[in-house]
């Protein structure tokens, strides 16, 4: 699950830029 955390952060950051 810890490996999914950075992925989630990256996805949220990408959505924030839209």
Curated annotation (Swiss-Prot):
The modification Leucine amide is found at residue 18. The keyword rRNA processing does not apply. Expressed by the skin glands. GO terms for biological process: defense response to bacterium; innate immune response; killing of cells of another organism. Its main location: secreted. Keywords: Amidation, Amphibian defense peptide, Antibiotic, Antimicrobial, Cytolysis, Hemolysis, Immunity, Innate immunity, Secreted. Signal peptide: none annotated. It comes from the Eukaryota. The keyword Secreted applies. One of its GO terms (cellular component) is extracellular region. It is found in: Secreted. Belongs to the frog skin active peptide (FSAP) family. Medusin subfamily. The primary structure of this peptide is identical to that of Medusin-PT (AC A0A1M4BLT1). Antimicrobial peptide with activity against Gram-positive bacteria S.epidermidis ATCC 12228 (MIC=50 uM) and S.aureus (MIC=64 ug/ml and MBC=128 ug/ml). Not active against some Gram-positive bacteria (methicillin-resistant S.aureus (MRSA), E.faecalis), Gram-negative bacterium E.coli ATCC 25922 and fungus C.albicans at concentrations up to 100 uM. Can only slightly inhibit the formation of biofilm by S.aureus (minimal biofilm inhibitionconcentration MBIC=512 ug/ml, minimal biofilm eradication concentration MBEC>512 ug/ml). This is Medusin-TR1. It comes from Phyllomedusa trinitatis.
């Amino acid at each position: 699950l810890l490996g999914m955390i950075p992925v989630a952060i990256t996805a949220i950051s990408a959505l924030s830029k839209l």
